[in-house]
Amino acid sequence: MYKRQTLNNGIKSVPTEEENYLIDLYEKGSQKADVIKMVPASGSATRMFKKLFTFMETYKGEAEEFLKFVQDKSPDSMHEFFLHLNEFPFYTHLKNVMWNDEQDLQKMLDKRMFTNILAYILTEKGLNYGDTPKGLVDFHVYRDFVRTPFDEHLVEAALYCKKGREAHLHFTVSEEYVPRFKDRLAKVSKVFEKMFNVKYKVTFSIQKPSTDTVSIDENLSLIHISEPTRLRCIS
């Protein structure tokens, strides 16, 4: 793959009048096959929070710094992040963790204690998102429940990977995160099994680091070390 896919360039748009036919075709065909939802989930959330880490480690709260902070109104600025903090799915979780430490999130915002708040988001002091797989970060807020991406894959599997009452999923994960994924599965699987009248069959595997390969862009510059897929399966 040399560039991202877009509509009509690697991605096909299905006409509305064909949707029901294709859905019916899949649902009938899937009952005659062994369907499994396979999800690459080994990515860490560290890169997602790179800007937050940088700010936490460098911001001192001096007058000149704060002036630059409030003047930067770009969508991905730290000012906008804190201004809209209450809109993030992890907001309630963050408030509760801080409250357990007898810390009031709103008061800390009022006192401009930005790096302290980030410590509760990124480190073991609080949510520890700096050492959390992306699949386990709070992702979608529902009326009485916050789902992670991992949860959403379970829901999707119940909706389109079910044969009889069983839905099969396989996740590739980083070895150090296996216990955390299994803990999350134990916590939410019964909820979704009851909600969707399904029984989950979930397996995990680990990609061996020795299979990592180098990726480059069109300028022959190194992008990352990742890619294909010889996997070590675990229960």
Predicted feature residues:
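Low-complexity, serine/threonine/proline-enriched polar segments
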Residues: L67-L127
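Single conserved hydrophobic/aromatic residue that forms the stacking wall/gate
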Residues: M1-Y2, I223-S235
